[in-house]
Structures are given as C-alpha cells and as structure tokens.
C-alpha cells in the first residue's frame, strides 16, 4: 500500500467528508506530512516538510521492550525510508522516559541523523521503592546512555521561547525543563474560564514528564501542538489564568491520553479541530481524557492509534478511526496526516486507507 510520502498528488474528499482511497491519502507536494507511528504505547511522530526536511519527535522504546517485532527504531527507519528519506534532519526528545527516548541509541546506530534537540539534563531520581529490575529503564540510567549515543551529533537544548525553522515548518518551544514561556504567543492571551475550577494534581508519573519539551509547530496558517507528556500542573501554568499558546488545528494528545495531563483548561484554550491520540492498547486513553478531548470546542474528529482495551465502547472512537483495533497482535499500523498551509487537514487510517478531510 502506498503511503502519503510516496505519492505527491492530492485527491480531495470534501470538507469533513470521508473517502476510501485505494492506496492511502494522496497529498499535495506543498503539504506537511505527519506519521504518528505505532510504537505500542510509546511515542514517535515523524514530520516531513514539502522541502523534504524532517523532524522526528521521540523514538519509542529500547529494542526488545515495548514495541517488538519490529522494535521502535526499526519501525521509525522503515517509515523514513518509505517516505524517501535518507536522513532524519532533527530528532527532538521531549523527555527521558523509556517510552520516548528508549529507541534513540538503536536509531542512531542504524540510520543517519542530524541535530538532536532536548530540554537539557535529566533531573528525575528513581523512587526508593523501585524494583531492581526496573532501575535500568529509569531516566537516571537512560540519560547517560543517551549522552553516549548522541556524542558527535549536533545538539541543541531548547528553552521556552526558542524557535527553529525546518524548511517551511516553524517550531516554538512553549515549555522546557519545567519552565513555561513568559509571554503569550501571538493570538493568545484569552482568559480561560475552566481555570477557576482547576486544582493542582499530586501525581505526575515522574518528574521528567513535567520537564517535557513542549512545542507548537506552525506551517503556513496551520498550527500543531505536540507537548510530549506535559503534566496537568504544567498545563495550569501554561494556560491559567490566561492562555499563552492560542488555538491550534491539530493536537497530538498529550501523555498518550493519560488523565495526568489533558486538562479541560488546556483543551478549551487549544480548541483543536483534529486530535490524534498515540495510546497503546492498555496504556493511556483514559476515560477522563477521552471525555475532555471529545468536548473540546471546534473538535471535528478524534483518532486513536489503538483500541483502548480498558475503556468501554462509549469511550473509544468508532473502529473506522482506530489504526489498530485488534486485541493484541496488531500490525503496528500508523495514522498519517497531510496538512496544507491554508489549514486543511486530511487524516488517513493506514489499516484501511480510509481518509477524512477537515
């Protein structure tokens, strides 16, 4: 089956009209192509500009853990080659949890990579009761391996407010290392009513989550929010009492859809038209998040990488909008997105070739 990156023509399906294409969604040569890879509850999202420059956000799990047969790095490399890439220009690591940074050493050893972007040093210390078998997969153990792996590569630590142009794709860091931008981005600054009832949360899933390098990506008039595993309390600082980010067109649902993130205040502020959730079959996609995202103003459609097995049918999207609906043993199918500079969004389920345009 041909993918977005291998066919550079456009076939319109109409505004919010679904269609079944024989080979997957066909995209114009001036579109931004996005592939949300299935790395079994980890994170790995590939962005390819019309200039054929590339950005990978996160790298999934280490080999033989999480995503296996093939592992996360192999899935990323296969996607890059499928889209005609011989190099990944930028790899951005949002934070140093195993499901986000684990695949990087294997990736760097097997495929050319340019510049590495991150939030700076890991500061998470393993809890005293962590089982010995888990210690090698904690940030304290993974971060030294990360530094060893990126040695010799161009490396940039992004701070809040830093920007980067990747061809016609423009990146702005809105949080990094537990710090938010000081001033609202252009078009932001609205008071968010949901802030009045928002209370701090005493759980964060690990300190590195709160230190996620969260970015807003701008492509023409289109805006995309990709916040890694940014936590509820950091969202409160970023969106309350006034929104510092502004509305977006596409939202990569934070933290795999965990209820430790994805506050009503953030969804009110971002008001995405389309959301893609990179959940696993039994990881993320919490009921509270499903309800919050589904109620976001302007939302036309939520897509899921997996059926959320812990939720009922009312808290999963219809199977048409799920890339991997099977109970275990899926085919690691991606969700692909084509974004135009005018803000048009076409999302394709690679399992079926079904596309919908918004």
Outline where the language-model segments fall.
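Non-globular, low-confidence helical/coil segments that flank catalytic cores
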Residues: 2-6, 10, 25-358
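Bacterial N-terminal signal peptides
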Residues: 10-23
């Amino acid at each position: 089956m041909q993918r977005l990156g291998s066919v550079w023509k456009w076939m319109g399906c109409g505004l919010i009209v679904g269609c079944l294409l024989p080979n997957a969604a066909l995209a114009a040569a001036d579109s931004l192509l996005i592939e949300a890879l299935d790395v079994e509850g980890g994170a790995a999202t590939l962005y390819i500009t019309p200039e054929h420059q590339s950005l990978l956000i996160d790298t999934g799990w280490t080999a033989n853990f999480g995503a296996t047969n093939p592992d996360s790095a192999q899935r990323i490399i296969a996607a890059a080659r499928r889209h005609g890439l011989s190099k990944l220009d930028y790899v951005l690591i949002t934070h140093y949890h195993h499901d986000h940074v684990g695949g990087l050493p294997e990736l760097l050893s097997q495929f050319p990579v340019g510049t590495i972007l991150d939030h700076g040093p890991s500061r998470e210390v393993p809890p005293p009761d962590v089982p010995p078998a888990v210690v090698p997969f904690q940030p304290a153990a993974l971060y030294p391996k990360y530094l060893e792996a990126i040695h010799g590569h161009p490396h940039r630590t992004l701070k809040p407010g830093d920007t980067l142009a990747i061809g016609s794709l423009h990146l702005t860091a809105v949080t990094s290392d537990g710090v938010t931008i000081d001033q609202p981005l252009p078009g932001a600054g609205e008071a968010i009513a949901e802030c009045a009832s928002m209370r701090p949360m005493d759980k964060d899933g690990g300190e590195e989550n709160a230190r996620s390098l969260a970015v807003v990506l701008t492509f023409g008039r289109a805006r995309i929010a990709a916040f890694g595993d940014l936590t509820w309390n950091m969202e409160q600082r970023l969106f309350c009492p006034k929104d510092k980010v502004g509305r977006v067109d596409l939202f990569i649902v934070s933290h795999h859809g965990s209820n430790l993130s994805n506050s009503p205040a953030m969804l009110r502020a971002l008001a995405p038209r389309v959301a893609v959730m990179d959940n696993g079959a039994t990881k993320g996609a919490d009921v509270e998040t499903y309800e919050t995202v589904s109620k976001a103003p302007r939302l036309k459609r939520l897509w899921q990488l997996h059926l959320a097995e812990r939720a009922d049918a009312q808290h999963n999207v219809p199977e048409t909008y799920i890339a991997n609906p099977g109970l275990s043993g899926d085919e690691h199918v991606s969700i692909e997105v084509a974004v135009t500079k005018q803000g048009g969004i076409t999302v394709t389920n690679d399992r079926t070739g079904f596309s919908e345009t918004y």
